[in-house]
């Protein structure tokens, strides 16, 4: 029973180890440190100048690392020169030498190097003082010969050949800097490629690319120059003290546990990441909210400086030679983007085909996925449409979220007098951050960020009310007067024809007209009084007589 349990535990441990190493994908050795999606190059310390002594002698220093047992040195085409061999390795090496009488050979003390001379001619090997490193040899050579033409690092060489081509460098002082030895025209190096220096795997998928570079703990790499040849997200993980430098300026997202410089702008480590692939995978997918990883690579090259190129995998375009990549003149020095919104809560984005009315306020969000912790400063904005350019006033909008982008708002009222068209909204921005060493603020140079927007002038709606001019007012007044005269005449005529007495007079007519003018109706708002009837004078006398007789009768009867 115990044996069965032990076997099960052992199987579980093996499965767990296998799962941890292949949790992302199955790693494979990259032959020559180059394939379709990743290229790795060593960047050893070296230098190259145009120095020559007074008699035209060049001075070259060859630093041997990981000495092979046998290699070849070809000096047949070399110019008149001094060649100094040095190595910090205790391993013995033998060099097959094709010498040149115009070349003097020096070997530093404690460098175990033996030359094999095919012609068996006497060979004079001069001894240089012992040196602990290349810098010390460089100082000794500069003091002895007055200067140094070149310092070249040769790691595990097969052949070292001097071509005799003259260099064309302007500098006369040799200062050690990371370099690519193959760029020197006067020397050709053929090196033995290190074994298992680079392992990588690639997984094709649609959507945004995510690349992971892992330098396991214990590897001595400390400086990595990275070239990203397309927009992507990248995880850069290395031992403590590793420094990453990103050379280009694409729209990229970065996650790292080390210090990063992007276009000379420092980025602080985001989070602690172990060299375990499972931990890296989990944190990468969570940080970028992604479901896929495009490539995973492990670098185990024990050198100080390396250079790395990463691109999208394409069967039709496999990079066999690495070309120098220089930013295009139109590309910004750092990746920033601008998004436009139609609402002050920045939740309704404006697409490129939408038209914005000039009387509406537009809200802009300027952000950098790469520099999330950096503050963005906007100095000025303008709109441009050939050949018109106008300054664009803006207002900063508040933001209360973590790592908030820069928020602004604009009004296109300044374009109200221009026809509808396409405009480039452009702002000059710079990124600012605090240096980790001295806590001083550091800002990038200003760079433009722009977004195209379709602007349509605002057209107010037409008023449906009538507008009267002076002539219309005078015409209405005269018409009202004429209607009043006609109505007055008509009323007067009606009164005469119906037998109304003159006693009605003008007062009654005036009263009716006043009611008419006030109420707008002949009936008026007041109750009309009954019209008394007045008899003619003849009738009036007889009436008086009858009244008088009538009044006397009751008197007599009562009497």
UniProtKB/Swiss-Prot annotation:
Glycans are attached at residues 55, 79, 109, 133, 170, 302, 352. One of its GO terms (molecular function) is type II transforming growth factor beta receptor binding. It is found in: Cell membrane. It comes from the Eukaryota. Residues 547-559 have a biased composition (Polar residues). Disulfide bonds join 25-201, 47-174, 381-427. Residues 528-559 are annotated as: Disordered. It is a single-pass type I membrane protein. Disruption phenotype: Viable, with survival to adult stages. Brain tissue shows widespread vascular malformations with localized widening of blood vessels. During embryogenesis, blood vessel connectivity between the dorsal aorta (DA), intersegmental vessels (ISVs) and posterior cardinal vein (PCV) appears normal at 72 hours post-fertilization (hpf). However, blood flow through ISVs is significantly reduced. Blood vessel pruning is increased, probably due to aberrant hemodynamics. Arterial ISVs have a slightly increased diameter, while venous ISVs have greatly reduced diameter. GO terms for biological process: angiogenesis; blood vessel development; blood vessel morphogenesis; cell migration; cellular response to mechanical stimulus; endothelial cell morphogenesis; epithelial to mesenchymal transition; heart development. Residues 536-546 have a biased composition (Low complexity). InterPro entries: ZP-C_dom (IPR042235). One of its GO terms (cellular component) is plasma membrane. This is Endoglin.
């Amino acid at each position: 029973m115990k044996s069965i349990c032990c076997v099960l535990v052992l199987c579980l441990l093996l499965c767990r180890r296998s799962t941890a190493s292949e949790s992302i994908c199955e790693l494979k050795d990259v032959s020559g440190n180059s394939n379709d999606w990743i290229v790795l190059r060593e960047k050893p310390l070296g230098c190259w100048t145009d120095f020559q002594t007074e008699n035209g002698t060049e001075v070259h220093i060859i630093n041997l690392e990981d000495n092979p047992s046998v290699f070849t040195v070809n000096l047949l085409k070399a110019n008149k020169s001094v060649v100094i061999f040095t190595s910090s390795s205790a391993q013995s090496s033998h060099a097959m030498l094709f010498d040149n009488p115009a070349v003097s050979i020096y070997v530093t003390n404690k460098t175990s190097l033996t030359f094999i001379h095919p012609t068996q001619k006497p060979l004079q090997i001069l001894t240089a003082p012992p040196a602990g490193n290349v810098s010390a040899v460089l100082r000794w050579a500069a003091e002895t010969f007055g200067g140094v033409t070149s310092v070249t690092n040769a790691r595990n060489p097969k052949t070292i050949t001097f071509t005799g081509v003259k260099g064309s460098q302007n500098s006369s002082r040799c200062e050690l800097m990371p370099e690519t030895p193959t760029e020197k025209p006067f020397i050709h190096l053929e090196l033995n490629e290190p074994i298992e220096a680079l392992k990588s795997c690639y997984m094709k998928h649609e959507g945004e690319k995510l690349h992971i570079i892992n330098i396991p703990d214990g590897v001595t790499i400390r400086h990595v120059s990275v070239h990203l040849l397309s927009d992507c997200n990248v995880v850069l993980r290395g031992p403590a003290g590793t420094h990453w430098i990103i050379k280009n300026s694409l729209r990229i997202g970065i996650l790292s546990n080390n210090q990063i410089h992007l276009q000379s702008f420092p980025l602080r480590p985001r989070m602690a990441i172990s060299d375990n692939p499972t931990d890296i995978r989990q944190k990468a997918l969570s940080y970028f909210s992604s479901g896929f990883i495009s490539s995973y690579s492990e670098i185990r090259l024990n050198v100080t400086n390396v250079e790395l190129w990463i691109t999208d995998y394409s069967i039709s375009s496999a990079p066999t030679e690495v070309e120098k990549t220089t930013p295009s003149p139109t590309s910004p020095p750092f990746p920033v983007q601008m998004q436009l919104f139609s609402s002050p809560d920045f939740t309704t984005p404006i697409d490129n085909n939408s038209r914005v009315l000039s009387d509406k306020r537009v809200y802009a969000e300027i952000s950098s996925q790469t520099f999330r912790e950096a503050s963005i400063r906007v100095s000025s904005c303008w709109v441009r449409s050939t050949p018109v350019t106008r300054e664009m006033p803006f207002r900063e909008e508040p933001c209360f979220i973590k790592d908030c982008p820069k928020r602004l708002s604009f009004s296109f009222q300044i374009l109200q007098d221009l026809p509808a068209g396409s405009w480039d909204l452009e702002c000059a921005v710079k990124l600012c951050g605090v240096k980790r060493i001295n806590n001083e603020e550091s800002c990038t140079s200003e760079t433009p960020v722009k977004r195209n927007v379709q602007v349509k002038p605002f057209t107010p709606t037409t008023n449906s009310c009538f507008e009267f001019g002076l002539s219309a007012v005078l015409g209405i007044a005269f018409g009202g007067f004429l209607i009043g005269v006609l109505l007055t005449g008509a009323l007067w005529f009606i009164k005469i024809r119906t037998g109304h007495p003159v006693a009605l007079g003008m007062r009654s007519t005036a009263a009716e007209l006043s009611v008419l003018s006030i109420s707008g109706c002949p009936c008026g708002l007041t109750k009309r009084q009954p019209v008394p009837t007045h008899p003619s004078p003849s009738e009036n006398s007889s009436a008086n007589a009858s009244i008088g007789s009538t009044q006397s009768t009751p008197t007599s009867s009562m009497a």
